[in-house]
Every structure is written in C-alpha cells, then in structure tokens.
Amino acid sequence: LNDGKNPFYSYDDFIKFRDHSSPYTHPSVNWCDELMNKNSTTQSYNLNATGGNKYAQYFISVGYVGENGLFKNPGGDAHDTNMTFDRYMISSKVNINITDDLTAKVTLMGRIEEGTQPGGTGNGYDDILSSIYSTPSNAYPVTNPDGSWGGSQSFNNNLLSQTINSGYITDGARDVLGAINLRYDFGKLVKGLSVRMVGSVTSQNRSTTKQTKTSEVFDYTIDKDGNDVYTRYGEKKTQSNSFSSVSTYRQMYGQLAVDYERQFGKHKFKASVLGDT
C-alpha cells in the first residue's frame, strides 16, 4: 500500500481539515459558497404607446432588461466587477398619409447592450467558473493571517482575488436600424397600379474593453520554531487597459417596385417588377 512511502497526510492532518482547528495551514474551503450567491435578480421594464389620427399613426416601445451576477462582491475594486448585463431597447413605427395617393411608413429601432464581468486571469468568468471545480478545498486558504491572498506554487491565482480584485471586462453592443417605405398609388391614372420605394440602413457594432490586473499570492507555513513563513508565488501586475472592436457591420439597402393588381370578374391578376441594391 502506498508503495512503502510515508502517508502524504497524517492522522493529525485529517483531524485539522475536519474540525477547522487550523484554517490557515489546513484549509477546507467550499469555493462555490465562498464566491457565489445562491440566487440573483433580473429586472424587466417595458413601456408602449400608440396613437394617431387619419393623417398619421404611431407606435413606440421602450424597454429595459437588467441582470445581476451570482458572484459575491464583499469589496475590492472601486468598480463593481460582478457579472452584470444591461439592455436598452427602443422601437418606433409611424404611418403617414402624406396625400390621398402617397403614404409613408417609417421604422426606427435601437438597442444598446453592456455586460460586465470580473477579469479573472484575463478571460473573465470562464477562468473563475472552471477553476471553482478544479481547485481542491484544501489547496489554500482564501486569505492568510496577515490578510494577504492565499495560494501555493501549484495554485498561484487566488480565486477570490480573481473575482473581486482582478479588474473587469466590459462587452458592448450597439445596433441601429432605420427604414422608410414610400408607396404611391397611380390608381387614378391606371387602376391597380402603384409604385413602392424602400430604403433601410443597418449598423451593428461589438466591442470589448479589458481593464485587468493580477495579484501575487502567498503560501503560509509555520517553521519548526513556530515562526510564520510566507512564500510568494505569482506576479503582481498593474491594471492594463485595452479596447478592441470585435466586429462592425453596416448595410444600406434600397428597393424599387412597380405593382399591378386587378380583379377581372372572378379572376385576380397580380404582378410585380422589383429592383434592389
């Protein structure tokens, strides 16, 4: 058994892990409970308005969705590094009877999204969530007796430090759509004839801002004389700042259509000629 080698843990070690009598040298940390709340909150608001008269009709919708993160944030960075998500939306449609023959439909839509997450080791919450399940409960204490971050040679990125003291990453999205549809009825000249002109502009942008940093950790032990010994691992790096435009998309679209629709007795005829760009 054990190839004749001495046991890695003694009976005294197991007792200390179990009764938490020496939490700094024999930690037993439930990382899920230490880092994450059991629940979170989501907010959603929407306001709609409609109205008009025989000349114009409108519809407007304004909405907001907000989600708070599951990470605990007992203090750390001045900027809240918890996972959050905010979305603002607005859409409007207006139908206008310019003349008896000419009508216009205008559509405007906009959306702004922003998500924040802790920096972790540079890749955000993915680093933290994967580390929660791969870090043993006895790997290191959350903090040492002197308040420094706990760690070891094998685990040189403290999980709580990654959550509240690693800076933050912000992902942003901006979407705008504008469209107009004009229709002229030539029925007074040629029954059933009309012309449509459609134009739209779409703009989408995705960006990421990273303001991340790392902290050193210390492996705490007690030497044979009873003195505290702190061995440093990892590297303390000041906050870096970077901005990247992940994607930018713009599209302009135009269409011209000539429509003809007539009813001849029991027969209905409909034809369209389209051109777009």
Predicted features by range, described:
Residues 23-63, 67-70, 81-157, 167-174, ...:
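Flexible loop and strand-edge segments within Gram-negative outer membrane beta-barrel domains
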Residues 1-21, 120:
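Conserved small-residue
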